[in-house]
Amino acid sequence: MADLQNDFSWSKSRHDKFRECSRAYFNTYYGSWGGWSAPASSPVRELYVLKKLSSRWQWAGSVVHDAIKQLLTRARASGDLWPLERLQEQTRQKARAQFAASREKSYWRESSRIVGLTEHEYGEPVTDADWKRLYESVIDGSLRAFFQSEVLEEIRRTPHDRWLGVDELDHWFFEGTKIWVAVDFAYRDAEGRVHLLDWKTGKERGVDHTQVASYALYARQKWDVKPDGVVGGLVYLVQEEGRPAERTSVAADEATLEACRTLMRGSIAEMRAALVDREKNVARVEDFPQTEDRERCARCAFRRPCGRI
C-alpha cells in the first residue's frame, strides 16, 4: 500500500488552531504525522496520542454528536427511530466504557482509534460530582432536549429521500485547496431549500458566520443549490431541565459568503507562508512559535512536550 501523503488542506477547525497557537497547530498537523505507526517512546507518537485527547467538555460533546449520528443513520437505513430510552442506554454504556479506558490511560496502547481525556492524562482534579453533573447536563440533558425539540419533529416529517447527509466527512475545493467539512445533518425542504444543521453542546450562543458560510459554499458545490437556497441552523442542545433544544436559523447571504471567501483566502495564504516547502507541505517546528497565553497552555493537550506544565 502506498504511503499516506500529508497534503495541505483547510478547515474551520484548522484555522482556529492556527489562530490560537501556531505550535499547537504544528504539533497537530505536522509534528504528529505518522504517529499511528511510530515507536511507543518516540516524540512523534507522543504528539499523535496527545492530539487525540480532549477535555471533558469536548468529550461530552463528541458523545452527544456520535449518539445523534447513530440515531439518524440507523433511521435513514431502517426507517425506524429509536426511542429516547434506548438511545440513552446505548450512550450510557459507550460513555462509561470510554471513561473507564481513559482513566486507565489505555489510549497509549491503541494504534489509531484513540479516545482519552486530558484531565486523566495530566491528573487534573475533577470531583465525582462534577463528572456526574457533566453527564447529566450535557450528555443526557442534550439527548432529552433533542427528543423534545421541533428540530427532531421536522426531521421525522422529512421524507428520507430528502435527507442529504448525516455527519459525513466530505470535502470541496476552493481556489485549488481542499476544504474539509462535516455537516451534522443536511436535508432539503419541500420548497427546495437546503438546511444545514449543526449540533451545539457549548454554552456560547454567538453565531459563527465563517462556519455557516463555509457550509453554504460547500452545499452550493455539492448539491447545486441557488445562492439564496441554503439555510444554516444552529441547534443548541444544552438547555435548562425540561426545555427542548433551540434552533437559530442563519441565512448565508452573498455578503457573508464573500467575507468567508476572503477569510479563507487569507488564512490559507498565512498557513502556506509558514511552510519551508509549500509544494511538498513541509514545516519546521522553529517556524511555529508557542503562544504567550499561559492560560490557554493550561488547557492544551500539548503542555508537556511544550514544557508548559
What positions do the PLM features span?
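Active-site-proximal structural scaffolding
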Residues: 8, 178, 208-212, 293, ...
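A non-catalytic, helix-rich entry segment at domain boundaries
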Residues: 63, 67-164
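Short amphipathic alpha-helical segments and their helix-coil junctions
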Residues: 4-7, 28-51, 191-197, 274-283
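Nuclease catalytic cores
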Residues: 15-31, 40-76, 96, 132-136, ...
